[in-house]
Curated annotation (Swiss-Prot):
Keyword terms, alphabetized: Cytoplasm, Methyltransferase, rRNA processing, S-adenosyl-L-methionine, Transferase
Reactions catalysed, as given in the entry: guanosine(527) in 16S rRNA + S-adenosyl-L-methionine = N(7)-methylguanosine(527) in 16S rRNA + S-adenosyl-L-homocysteine
Species whose genome carries this gene: Pseudomonas putida (strain GB-1)
Principal location: cytoplasm
Taxon lineage: Bacteria, Pseudomonadati, Pseudomonadota, Gammaproteobacteria, Pseudomonadales
Name of the molecule in the record: Ribosomal RNA small subunit methyltransferase G
Length: 216
């Protein structure tokens, strides 16, 4: 274990994952802590996250990412984390689901350099890092799932990514407060499939997940 990661961090991750109903193997646990160590190290120079205190990163980044894993369905194999930033939730998704293809996209070169380093050091062969504005990204095929965490408004999230999915794609928007005001401006061809209030161990404040689809 890196000297940047403490036994308390390891215990908080294990306990929080159990509370979320997420089963972590020893390899999952090791790689998530390895990711945490890289995040702590690189954040000092690269400003990857506004969370400066390493003791807050387990709950606010790792467990927050794990809180949506039960909504990542097995039949959906090709995922995009748009506006990934420091890699949440894309890196935890790639760690927990090594047989799924996960793409993390960000327009900030420093952040994509960090994500590339994470891919190399943790040997995440299922991870693809893309340095691009989302509107300019042209994948070879639609994604099965598109997820974002505090990326933009619901209107922008759906409009900017509509060309990256189709009517079979699920869009997952991770939000803090319920975005009722944003849903009013949701494009007419998108519909909310479900809404979930999430409880993240160690995190204060509201968390919500909205799952959307495009109408046929």
């Amino acid at each position: 274990m890196s000297s940047l990661v403490t036994p308390q961090h390891a215990e908080e991750l294990s306990t929080g994952a159990r509370q979320l109903g997420v089963e972590l193997s020893a390899e999952h646990h090791e790689k998530l802590l390895g990711y945490l160590a890289l995040l702590i190290k690189w954040n000092k120079a690269y400003n990857l996250t506004a969370v400066r205190d390493p003791d807050e990163m387990v709950s606010r980044h790792l467990l927050d990412s794990l809180s949506v894993m039960s909504f990542i369905h097995n039949e959906r194999d090709n995922w995009l984390d748009v506006g990934s930033g420091g890699g949440m939730p894309g890196i935890p998704l790639a760690i927990l689901h090594p047989h799924k293809r996960v793409t993390v996209l960000d327009a900030n070169g420093k952040k994509t350099r960090f994500l590339t380093q994470v891919k190399m050091e943790l040997k995440l062969d299922n991870l693809t890092v893309i340095h691009s504005r989302v509107e300019a990204f042209q994948p070879a095929q639609p994604f099965d799932g598109i997820i974002s965490r505090a990326f933009s408004s619901m209107e922008n999230f759906t409009n900017w990514t509509r060309h990256l999915g189709d009517t079979g794609t699920q869009w997952l928007a991770m939000k803090g407060l319920h975005p009722a005001d944003e849903l009013v401006a949701l494009p007419a061809d998108f519909t909310v499939e479900s809404e979930q209030a999430l409880t993240v161990p160690g995190c204060q404040g509201q968390r919500h997940l909205l799952i959307l689809r495009r109408k046929a």
